[in-house]
Amino acid sequence: MAKKGMINRELKREKTVAKYAAKRAELKATIANVNATDEERFDAMLKLQALPRNASPVRLRNRCGLTGRPHGYFRKFGLSRNKLRDTVMQGDVPGVVKASW
């Protein structure tokens, strides 16, 4: 089980990313716009750099929904490999069966 502080930190990052998503997209569009003047693009770059670091979606980490474990994460299920195995063996995940050949 991950520390509660780490899980809370990740939730805080998710909220920050959602809060600044529109502003980041607008600034990035201005920077990528070829028709914008150099001054506008430079100002947009400075404003983008002034945003909080945790506003960038790159800083998010996928974590297990049950334990908060950051490694061995399966996106399709939202669980780590350990908890995925446990839930599949209990029959809690529909459509998943143990491999047999």
UniProtKB/Swiss-Prot annotation:
The keyword RNA-binding is assigned to this record: yes
Keyword rRNA-binding: yes
Gene3D superfamilies per UniProt: 1.10.287.1480
GO biological process, one term: translation
Alphabetic keyword roster: Ribonucleoprotein, Ribosomal protein, RNA-binding, rRNA-binding
PROSITE patterns assigned: RIBOSOMAL_S14 (PS00527)
GO cellular component: cytoplasm; small ribosomal subunit
GO molecular function, one term: structural constituent of ribosome
Annotated Pfam families: Ribosomal_S14
Function summary: Binds 16S rRNA, required for the assembly of 30S particles and may also be responsible for determining the conformation of the 16S rRNA at the A site.
Family label: Belongs to the universal ribosomal protein uS14 family.
Protein name, UniProt field: Small ribosomal subunit protein uS14
Native source species: Acinetobacter baylyi (strain ATCC 33305 / BD413 / ADP1)
Gene for this chain: rpsN
